[in-house]
């Protein structure tokens, strides 16, 4: 169960109060110096983002058909020692990943478990295998880092991603159905269930 960096208030590097494309370009261009930092968001992706409803952070809520998207990201690490979370374990009970494939936490009614995506400018594949209470109701993705220093370097970034594979909605519902005693997982469960019932979900 990932810990969302917004809740800590200790490492927000963002210059954004609300969605502002010009700020995004300055931030990503200044930090695009090695394989740790993402590339700038494409003009076309910024333009597309303007047409969609925004979440509480001012970020677009996309339909599943739009796979290239700009998202707000935060960072977390098992070294934060979130209460109740096993050492370096994700919401599936397996180890968090930080290699060619890397772990990410998200609101599972937006990004079901197993969703895979690429971050523009980085060579890694990210997989949604975690969640966090601060992510509920948002389009934010929380990127896992193995230590506090890299977590803080990432901070709060607006980046471009490409969804390469949607996760498994049935698996998502099965996992969350057994965790409805917790407020955040209960909200995720019913939101995901409503989306599946609507038929407006991608199944690759």
Short names for language-model regions:
Residues 1-204:
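Solvent-exposed, well-ordered loop and adjacent helix/strand elements within mature globular domains
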